[in-house]
């Protein structure tokens, strides 16, 4: 019988572990040179939103960008959003994504232990902990349109208050609403 690790009272860690595991890039994937992450148009942007209908290759593009950023020495945290990621679960996913991507198992331990504060305080805690690291982190959030409203509000808050060592790439279908100033 399989066992599962528990994250405080939040439930099993297995589902979160699957959501922070990046997809593989197929070998036969056609490169898109004009969409390289190193392109001048994208290089120094703190936030990049990739928006397109289903099936247009958003996840494949993000997976390629992940490899580019890793090759440049950045820490890449991957999160595949899910409709069940309410704000507490979303924050735990963010913490686990950085812990896994940075190979720092103690990162976000307060959030991972189930002690997620109410409101946006948990996002502030996550941002502060990230700002205190000496890491340049690229956070990739795929399928952000699947997040419930409270988690989307947390993501928008994260985007507006990101520290200088965080770049965020968000992919969503055209119907994703993120309240973020340009």
Walk through the language-model features, giving the residues of each:
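Walker A (P-loop) ATP-phosphate-binding motif of ABC ATPase nucleotide-binding domains
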Residues: 47
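Hydrophobic anchor at the beta1->P-loop junction of P-loop NTPases
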Residues: 50
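Conserved ATPase-coupling elements of RecA-like P-loop NTPase cores
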Residues: 146-155, 180
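Conserved catalytic/switch belt of AAA+ P-loop NTPases
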Residues: 156-164
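Short regulatory helix/loop adjacent to the ATP-binding pocket of P-loop NTPases
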Residues: 174-182
């Amino acid at each position: 019988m399989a066992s599962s690790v528990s994250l405080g009272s939040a439930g099993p860690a297995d589902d979160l572990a699957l959501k922070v595991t990046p997809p593989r890039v197929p070998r036969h994937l056609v490169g898109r040179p004009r969409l390289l992450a190193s392109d001048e148009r994208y290089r120094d942007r703190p936030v990049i939103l990739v928006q397109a209908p289903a099936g247009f290759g958003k996840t494949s593009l993000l997976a390629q960008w992940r490899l580019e950023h890793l090759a440049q020495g950045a820490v890449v945290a991957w999160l595949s959003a899910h409709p069940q990621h309410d704000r507490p679960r979303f924050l735990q996913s963010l913490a686990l994504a950085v812990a896994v991507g940075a190979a720092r198992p103690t990162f976000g331990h307060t959030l991972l232990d189930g002690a997620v504060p109410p409101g946006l305080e948990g996002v502030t805690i996550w941002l502060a902990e990230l700002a205190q690291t000496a890491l340049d982190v690229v956070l990739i959030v795929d399928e952000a349109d699947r997040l419930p409203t409270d988690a989307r509000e947390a993501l928008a808050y994260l985007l507006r208050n990101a520290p200088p060592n965080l770049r965020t790439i968000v992919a969503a279908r055209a119907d994703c609403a993120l309240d973020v100033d340009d």
